[in-house]
């Protein structure tokens, strides 16, 4: 419906704005418009994983392990020049942000790691982006 489309566009803009604030290198930011579809996919994946773990009453330790394994998927070593090139051409956010930006928007992550406002990955609840 028209209302669904409007709601989706508002939601999508919030995700674009959220990712566009991440500075990857001095003066170089993620292009939230270019990466939005992949960002939605990453956010959806970790939110589904979190919900499944909560539904099966996984322990905090099991949930932390799942998040650690998710982070390991995106470990890479590359040059700064290569990262700058990817910012210009890739439809994915840089791997570091595929982990940090996603987990920083996941409420369960805050609970199992006891994150507080002074922690580097902390984002206030009203600024976190959600898919579901």
Q: What is each residue range found by the language model?
A:
Residues 1-132:
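Zinc-dependent metallohydrolase catalytic domains
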